[in-house]
Amino acid sequence: MLARAKNDNEETAVGESIDLVRLNFNPQAQLGLNIVLALVMFGIALDLRVADFKVALRTPKALAIGLVSHHLLFPAFTFALVMLVRPAPSIGLGMLLVASCPAGHISNFFTHRARGKTELSVSISTLSMLASIVMTPLNVGFWAAQDAQMGALLRSFSLDPLHMLGDIAMLLGVPLAAGMLIAARLPAFAKKAHGPMRVFSLLVLVGFVVGALALNWAVFREYARFVVFVVLIHNALALAGGYGFARAAGLVERDRRSVAFETGIQNSGLGLVLVFNFFDGLGGMAIVTAWWGIWHIVAGMILSTYWMRRPPLPARAAVAGQA
């Protein structure tokens, strides 16, 4: 009994020590990550047109459900999960940061693969990016302040929400606007450049995430047991919660699948940039964000493969079945 209590105390001490860990990521690599993320956004924007948003606005309910699920429900569910699991404060902050990031555009690929509504997915992703300029610092600050430990840790960094807002605007808003402008003015060039640019930038971004883990492998190996399972549950909650909310709202199956991926696939690249720009590479936050960036691809492939083999019913048939 005493031995077990001693082991539990040691486990708790090791788990809490992650709040003191700072990951190794030099300023040059940090600048490179910022540039790569901007290139990812620019590459995505080369394939966006104002007409794409007009198409999405024909189904405003589905668009609104997707944005509410992503920016309001998921952060709230994340806070509830943190309160239930009670991880180390830096891990909890990492979970909140991931939940507050915009949707990752690989969600569009998973939606298409899962036979969801791709145009809805693209619209939610893009509007989510724009909304995140305000919603990311707002959600992180609001939900962290609801817990004394996370709030104290957040205050220790003297975080300026306006500074974070400005950085997100530069990393997302400027490349997005530049890409859409080039797409409108030079459509032939944008069409040729979009594919190679998107593939190249995404591969480099994944390389940065993997590289960050490799450089800090000893730290990850020591603390992985505190993060891996939590990220799995967190991601599953996001995917299931997005789908369940869309179903409860009365959306058709294709739209439900889109909302599921738009809620459960996050822009972890932006999250990693923010961890190093504003939180000094805080161990728990960085490990959660980096591991999420790997795991949500695995989970997205599994779920999209499952749905790919189960074509959604046509809208009329689905309504008839519910009746």
Which residue ranges define each predicted feature?
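Alpha-helical transmembrane segments of multi-pass small-molecule/ion transporters
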Residues: 4, 10-323
